[in-house]
Amino acid sequence: MGGMISQVMVANYPSRVKSFTMISSTASTPNPFNGPEFKITRQLLKRSAAKDDIEGRIEQSIKLFGLIGTPDTNYDTPEFREDMRSYIKRGGDDGGFIRQMAAIIGSKNRKKLVKSIQTPTLIIHGDIDPLIKVKNAYQAHKLIGSSELIIVEGMGHLLDKNAFKKFQSQLIK
């Protein structure tokens, strides 16, 4: 959702932005053709409807991250569990997660707005992103004519250290 918000900001207030990086984002409203696979949608719904205690919500998060992250990444670690526990306690309930999902699904198509972006733009997307399909990155690259596109081999929707190393130098330019 941060990518969606930043697209609007960069398009509407270009004088306030020197450069723009889109990571795992889309200019389109999510739909069955450009959005997540069914198993991910199902897990998002389970996570959204979680009425579990904190440990149950952590388990739902581990399952979701396992689906949308980089394959073979172990999210069932003490560190991840503690991070999730902290986030869940800080947030209180899952209402924010539900509102975020509703905002994403209800968002307007931003293609025309994104096409107006003149700010130097770097688009980064994982080639195996199951949440926002990689074709969305190619579409954004086409819309923002002066953009640079990096497709990261083996990267899912979530950014991990190994994926970051693959484009770190381009990001720091």
Residues of each region from the PLM?
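Short glycine-enriched nucleophile-adjacent loop
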Residues: 3-14, 20
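Core-facing hydrophobic residues within beta-strands of well-ordered domains
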Residues: 17-18, 147
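Flexible "cap/lid" loop of the alpha/beta hydrolase fold
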Residues: 18-51
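Alpha/beta-hydrolase
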Residues: 40-112
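Short beta-strand/loop motif that positions the catalytic acidic residue
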Residues: 117, 123-125, 129
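Short alpha-helix in the alpha/beta-hydrolase fold that links the catalytic acid
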Residues: 119, 133-142
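Acidic catalytic loop of the alpha/beta-hydrolase fold
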Residues: 128-132, 157
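Catalytic active-site module of serine/aspartate enzymes centered on a nucleophile-bearing elbow/loop
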Residues: 146-173
